[in-house]
Amino acid sequence: MIAFTTDHIEMPALDERKVSRWIKAVAADYGFSVGNINYIFCSDERILEVNRQFLGHDYYTDIITFDYSTPTTVSGDIYISLDTVRSNAELFDATYDRELHRVIIHGLLHLTGQQDKTPETEAEMHRKEDRALSAVDSSYLGEASNDRLKPYDS
């Protein structure tokens, strides 16, 4: 089950059914089924609080992923700061929707075991995000007229 909730912030405009289908397709491409994934959309202040409390880090971030996966099933809690998503969209000259989808899939990629701790693994993570984003019809991200998801192919 994939759930989308908020923590004292307005829910972003998402077609949860389509996004869930996309997440499942990407997970399957990495050899995983989907267990329970909870996406929690929050503010910068809340993600800073989570970062301090659970990770001992005293800085803002766009995403924190708590991984409860098994060898065959991805599960976890994924906190996403919508404030940072908005800032990053401006910084990287992307639409808010595209950046939000990038961060959503970034969390899933962590659940599949992908890392981004070195320049090399960070670059590989970006390539994998781009590949997953290319599977989403551009209209779904607000960039064209057709609103269907493309199949996700390896």
Task: Please state what every model-predicted region is.
Residues I105, L109-G113:
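Short active-site segment of divalent metal-dependent hydrolases/proteases
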Residues M1-L100, T112-S154:
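An acidic/histidine-cluster motif and surrounding catalytic segment
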